[in-house]
């Protein structure tokens, strides 16, 4: 078996007229997984009496894949998360009445605000989804990772 080395020029210094070389071994391990090597599993979480922020941090870590040893920041290596009993989720302190969520329509004077109490009456899953969304990256990868979150009312889910 022949042992050979391939060198790559990483810097050429014209002043002193020498070359910095780095050795490239073709049999070295890759630091990141390829797309075809990624695997996903499913987690089921019961949100009964869970605090929104603490549950959102656990979910965002699972969705991003930070609980795996193969975590890669630029790839979607996370797992799917199913959350049930979302109507029984809670906030600490007086945040349920006092916290405000803002959104803007894009028109002048178009800022809208709502509290978790009003949001919980219409869409109980929206508060947790917003918390998880704001913990994920803001680009295309974050939007793709957010689709791995499934939230359902009650014990039964499809």
Stretch-by-stretch model annotation:
Residues 8-28:
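Short, Lys/Arg-enriched N-terminal segments with co-localized hydrophobic residues
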Residues 26-130, 137-140, 158:
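Ribosome large-subunit tunnel/peptidyl-transferase-proximal elements
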Residues 141-158:
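Charged phosphate-binding loop/patch that engages nucleotide di/tri-phosphates or the phosphate backbone
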């Amino acid at each position: 078996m022949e042992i050979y080395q391939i060198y790559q020029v990483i810097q050429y210094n014209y002043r002193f007229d020498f070359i910095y070389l780095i050795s490239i071994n073709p049999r070295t391990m890759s630091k990141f997984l390829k797309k075809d090597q990624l695997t996903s599993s499913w987690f089921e979480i019961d949100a009964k009496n869970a605090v929104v922020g603490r549950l959102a941090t656990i979910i965002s870590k699972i969705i991003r894949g930070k609980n795996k040893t193969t975590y890669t920041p630029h790839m979607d290596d996370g797992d799917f998360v199913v959350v049930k009993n979302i109507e029984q989720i809670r906030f600490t302190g007086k945040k349920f009445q006092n916290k405000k969520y803002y959104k803007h329509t894009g028109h002048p004077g178009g800022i809208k605000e709502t509290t978790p109490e009003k949001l919980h009456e219409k869409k109980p899953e929206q508060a947790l989804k917003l918390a998880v969304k704001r913990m994920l990256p803001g680009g295309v990868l974050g939007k793709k990772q957010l689709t791995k979150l499934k939230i359902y009312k009650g014990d039964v889910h499809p």
